[in-house]
């Protein structure tokens, strides 16, 4: 029984990433589906759908993934820290960008506080419906 995201690159070839399902079938990330997600998807997915494109820089994609996870953690008691974030730049051929994010991580705390504050701020700036 397996459900995972698997990706990487063989030297001289394009990089790729796959989502593998328990039945053995898989899907590959494409231009139309520039990211893959496993686990609880309903809370953080709208953020990914609105931000991530094929052209999104890797650092912005990582930030978006963490904001998505923060939203999921906020809305689902069964999801929590720690988080493992591995960023694998094209043609790097090694894993130098691994973060294990726990309750003490200052960057994740900042994301949590800033995202919540700014979301409430923009919500209050949108006009109420006219009846």
Feature locations, PLM:
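N-terminal nucleophile
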Residues: 1-131
């Amino acid at each position: 029984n397996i459900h995972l995201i698997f990706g990487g690159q063989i030297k001289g070839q394009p990089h790729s990433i796959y989502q593998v399902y328990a039945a053995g079938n898989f899907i590959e990330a494409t231009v139309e589906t520039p990211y893959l997600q496993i686990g609880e998807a309903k809370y953080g997915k709208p953020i990914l759908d609105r931000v991530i494109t094929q052209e999104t820089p890797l650092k912005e994609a990582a930030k978006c993934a963490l904001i998505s996870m923060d939203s999921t953690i906020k809305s689902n008691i069964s999801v929590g820290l720690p988080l493992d974030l591995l960023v694998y730049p094209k043609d790097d051929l090694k894993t130098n960008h691994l973060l294990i994010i726990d309750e003490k991580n200052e960057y994740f705390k900042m994301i949590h506080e800033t995202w919540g504050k700014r979301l409430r701020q923009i919500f209050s700036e949108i006009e109420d419906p006219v009846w």
